[in-house]
Swiss-Prot record:
An example Gene Ontology biological process: cell wall organization
Protein name: RNA-binding protein KhpA
Annotated ranges, domain KH: 29-75
Superkingdom of the source species: Bacteria
Family annotation (InterPro entries): KH_dom-like_a/b, KH_sf_prok-type, KhpA
């Protein structure tokens, strides 16, 4: 999933070479921390958080299990 998320993010940002995704488990949740160029933060979050919410929904559907997903954008 980490690789898929990186590929999607690289397709929507202006600085794809700076995209870094870290994946880990925290308190029974799957957590993805995203590091992008400061100029790309708004693009990743989207208007009213729509882009980041869509990414979360997509990953949840692909994982197909009951594990909750959290996506954090780190600067």
């Amino acid at each position: 999933m980490k690789e898929l998320l990186e590929k999607i993010l690289r397709g929507i940002v202006k600085h794809p070479e700076e995209v870094v995704v870290m994946e880990f488990d925290e308190e029974g949740k799957k957590v993805y921390e995203i590091v992008v160029n400061e100029e790309d933060v708004g693009q990743v979050i989207g208007k009213d958080g729509r882009t980041i919410k869509s990414l979360k929904i997509l990953l949840s559907a692909l994982m197909g299990d009951s594990k909750e997903i959290t996506i954090k954008v780190v600067r």
